[in-house]
């Protein structure tokens, strides 16, 4: 997946020359793949400690927290962007938005929401944080499956229910839901 993402994010996709370096692979792994995997580990670890189960009842929580609404809005913006670029067969421009989303998810959403996960009490805010991070990672795994298939399937396998398909590669590509977009909130957060 590191090689695949490195190459998809390189001039080679546009038919230009590429000077392949191991340093580029290390940077791709360090800046994109490890933070994404660490987001999954973060969710899994704290959900297990708190005994949180991603049952349909627990996932139907309303997003009252602005951070939750923001990351869900950004996810659906991302889905629309990637779908648009893929429809235009522009592979290079399909990858760039989700690479940026990994940074938003890990360096903004999770870092700004950590205290919500660390609370001792199982209040609604904590449950909303779990549900939001779960849904975002689950849907994101479907979005990135064509690009980084192994990590996306690892995320999917960790989060899936028995009623879900056996692999992310058997799932439908996610569709953007414009009703979950909050453009005003996105602009204020940017």
Q: How does the language model describe each region?
A:
Residues 1, 15-31, 64-66, 88, ...:
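Conserved phosphate-binding loops in nucleotide/dinucleotide-binding enzymes
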Residues 1-62, 160-164:
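Catalytic adenosine-cofactor/nucleotide-binding cores of aminoacyl-tRNA synthetases and other
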Residues 1-5, 26-41, 92-99, 103, ...:
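Non-catalytic, well-ordered alpha-helical scaffold segments
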Residues 8-12, 23, 91, 99, ...:
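An acidic- and aromatic-residue-enriched active-site/binding cleft used to recognize and process polar
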Residues 8-10, 31-44, 50, 65-78, ...:
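Core structural elements
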Residues 11-19, 77-89, 120, 175:
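Short, charged/polar, low-complexity loop and linker segments
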Residues 21-25, 98-99, 122-129:
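Conserved short loop/turn motifs at secondary-structure junctions
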Residues 50-80, 111-190:
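Acidic, turn-prone loop/beta-hairpin segments
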């Amino acid at each position: 997946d590191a090689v695949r993402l490195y190459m998809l994010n390189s001039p080679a996709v546009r038919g230009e020359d590429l000077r392949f370096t191991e340093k580029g692979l290390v940077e791709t792994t360090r800046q994109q793949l490890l933070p994404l995997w660490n987001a999954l580990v973060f969710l899994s670890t704290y959900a297990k400690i708190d005994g949180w189960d991603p049952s349909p009842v627990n996932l139907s929580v309303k997003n009252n927290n602005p951070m939750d609404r923001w990351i869900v809005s950004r996810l659906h913006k991302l889905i629309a962007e990637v779908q648009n670029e893929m429809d235009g067969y522009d592979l290079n421009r399909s990858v760039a938005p989700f690479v940026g989303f990994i940074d938003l998810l890990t360096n903004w959403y999770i870092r700004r929401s950590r205290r919500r996960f660390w609370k001792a009490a199982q209040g609604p805010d904590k449950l909303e944080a779990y549900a939001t991070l779960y849904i975002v990672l689950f849907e994101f795994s479907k979005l990135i499956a064509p690009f980084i298939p192994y990590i996306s399937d690892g995320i999917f396998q960790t989060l899936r229910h028995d009623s879900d398909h056996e692999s992310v590669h058997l799932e439908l590509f996610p569709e953007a839901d414009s009703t979950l977009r909050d453009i005003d909130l996105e602009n204020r957060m940017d």
